[in-house]
Amino acid sequence: MRGNIFEEILGQDSLFVDRRAFDHAFEPARLPHREHEVDSLVRNLVDALNGHIPSNMLLYGVPGSGKTVVTRFVLSQLREKGLEMGQTVKTYEINCRNVDTKYRVVQTIATQLAQRGDAPVPFTGWPTDRVLETVVSRMSRVGGVHIIVLDEVDNLVNKGGDDLLYALTSLNTLLGDGRCSIIGISNDLHFTQHLDPRVSSRLSQEDIVFHPYVATEIQNILGERASMGIKEGVL
């Protein structure tokens, strides 16, 4: 009887150094061809490191243009610098295609803010205003600056209207020690046309448009990924 069926494959040399380099969720240490967009985010969000409120932002662009990965990269660097400086900076990323109701968004934020001894906020059952009050209370307790990222925010608005955006952009009038900024990410360049003007003016204080990558840029990016993930000499 032959041995384990996996042994032959396990004994072969792999072509890969790190398969994660080809994963859609991979976050590289460098973002080629997005230097301008990174700089625009940094120039706004640096206020958080001084305890001030960054402007709310909207990031636009077609799917695959780097909006989410750029935002994650910048916020990771922001949190790292905040720790180094002793400045509290909390970030929350919510994909509004999966978390697509007002209740679920605020419940997710409240849960991420929970500390030992806090009552859990249920997935359903509480009035939404009560959950929002919990968010305000917990943000104020933590203090510092809180940055909420609403990825695919257009999906949330298309499904449930802009009431949540109005509530979130009003948080700073309710917070005690904490401060809050919103980053909306949308695939729809005309997204704000569907918003109440009051919401649009609050949310769209600074806009960044991510243009699609051109062929040579895609080639450069794939080349970098290949050098990170595939053994030298394979290609």
Where does each model-flagged region fall?
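Conserved catalytic segments around the Walker B and adjacent sensor/switch elements
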Residues: 56-58, 81-98
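Pre-Walker A adenine-sensing motif
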Residues: 39-50
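Mid-core helix/loop region of P-loop NTP-binding domains shared across ATPases and GTPases
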Residues: 2-6, 10-14, 18, 23, ...
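Active-site catalytic microenvironments for nucleophilic, acid-base chemistry
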Residues: 77, 81, 112
